[in-house]
């Protein structure tokens, strides 16, 4: 009986989505810094967070190849995606902390640039967790 219960519990918890290591509620509040440039709109067109269109829609960003969603990205971000960059919580946090430095390191190109000038000094983990929660994706 104990063994059956352990198996059932293991299957239950392994089936649940695992979100980024951050605080979802804090991420929702911190996203206010992002919404001047970004929105969150589901694939079905549901507006989760009304925001700007200077940056790409961040719905489903975690798990997506960089530079591939419908948006005019900079050449270096597209090149990073073509080189295999797929957003997860860790590289998302590193990117939003210093987009230009991230791309320069990822591409090993000291001249790489990002169209995103804003640097998020803290709260990236929380924002990643929030984005994962509203997109139904895991990190």
Swiss-Prot record:
PTM summary: Binds 1 heme c group covalently per subunit.
The UniProt keywords, alphabetically, are: Electron transport, Heme, Iron, Metal-binding, Signal, Transport
Q: Which residues bind heme c?
A: 34, 37-38, 116
Q: Which GO terms describe its molecular function?
A: electron transfer activity; heme binding; metal ion binding
Q: Which residues form the signal peptide?
A: 1-20
Q: Does the keyword Ribosomal protein apply?
A: no
Regarding protein family, the annotation reads:
Belongs to the cytochrome c family.
Protein name (record): Cytochrome c-551
